[in-house]
């Protein structure tokens, strides 16, 4: 059976706890997405439309509007100040959240690996090909993880949230560790996983300890780190083979912004690129910062 809660609920609880336990930058949080851009933009000279929408002065001259390049220029300055005024960035962290199934009887395909109830989630071939490529080829610039809770019911998830224990009850796997497999299975967060097709035992690790052990980039400043990473992501989306619909969706969305020649605003365009990447892949982009927090 599927775990009885929404994946977005787990993601929200997880991110909130991660922010409390370590120093982290959420480049595409809800607040910044609200500043970065709009969900959709339309322009119309139709007086009838403005009247229908209830604008009280529809009989005056049409709105002059604001050019998108003007907004982009302002946002370039805003984002530049923001990333300059935070601690040094360490690495780009991509998290793919998974809501598992909970297998409760011996007819489960992987039961013989555990001989008890266990959790399982599927790997989607095109998505995994992309994530594995990113982690394998980006070197020290990126860490790519699957994150899946060892919780069945939403009330248990809420209990863990209150206890500040969501992360301790999450199973983590690096993307490249699951190459050649189509599923990952586990019984609880702090133990090993067994990946399938051909069973392979994979040891778990402590996410917070891994983040705290990372060292900040010395060669580039925060803005350049973001610009470089988004450029790598853009290249990967263009060149990785076997990602089908992900490539098509990404290109279609990016072509909308290229039409307005937004590439001249490097930091703004980088954030836009990563926003589209998240929209298409569902992958959360986080950046650990230099400095520690007490859990």
Please provide the spans of the model-predicted regions:
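Acidic-basic catalytic patches of nuclease active cores, encompassing PD-(D/E)XK
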Residues: 1-36, 41-53
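Charge-dense, extended regions
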Residues: 248-295
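Enriched - but not universal
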Residues: 61, 114-117, 272, 288
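Acidic, metal/cofactor-coordinating or nucleic-acid-engaging core segments within structured domains
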Residues: 18-23, 85-93, 100-246, 251
């Amino acid at each position: 059976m599927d775990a009885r809660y929404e994946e977005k609920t787990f993601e929200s609880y997880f991110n909130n706890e991660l922010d409390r336990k370590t120093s982290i930058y959420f480049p595409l949080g809800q607040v910044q997405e609200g500043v970065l851009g709009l969900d959709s933009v339309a322009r119309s000279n139709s007086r009838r439309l403005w009247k229908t929408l209830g604008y009280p002065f529809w009989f005056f001259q049409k709105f002059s509007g604001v050019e998108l390049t003007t907004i982009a220029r302002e946002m370039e300055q805003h984002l530049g100040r923001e990333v300059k005024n935070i601690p040094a960035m360490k690495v780009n962290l991509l998290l793919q959240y998974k809501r598992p199934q909970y297998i409760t009887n011996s007819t489960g395909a992987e039961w013989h690996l555990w001989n008890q109830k266990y959790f399982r989630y599927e790997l989607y071939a095109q998505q995994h090909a992309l994530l594995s490529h990113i982690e394998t080829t980006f070197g020290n610039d990126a860490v790519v993880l699957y994150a899946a809770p060892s919780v069945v019911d939403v009330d248990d998830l809420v209990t863990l949230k209150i206890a500040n224990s969501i992360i301790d009850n999450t199973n983590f796997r690096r993307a490249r560790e699951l190459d050649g497999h189509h599923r990952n299975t586990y019984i609880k967060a702090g133990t090993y996983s067994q990946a399938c097709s051909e069973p392979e035992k994979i040891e778990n690790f402590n996410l917070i300890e891994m983040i705290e052990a990372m060292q900040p980039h010395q060669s580039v400043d925060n803005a350049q780190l973001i610009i470089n990473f988004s450029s790598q992501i853009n290249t990967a989306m263009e060149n990785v083979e076997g990602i089908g619909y992900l490539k098509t969706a990404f290109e279609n969305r990016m072509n909308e912004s290229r039409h307005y020649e937004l590439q001249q605003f490097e930091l703004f365009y980088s954030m836009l690129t990563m926003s589209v990447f998240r929209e298409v892949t569902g992958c959360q982009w986080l950046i650990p910062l230099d400095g520690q927090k007490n859990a």
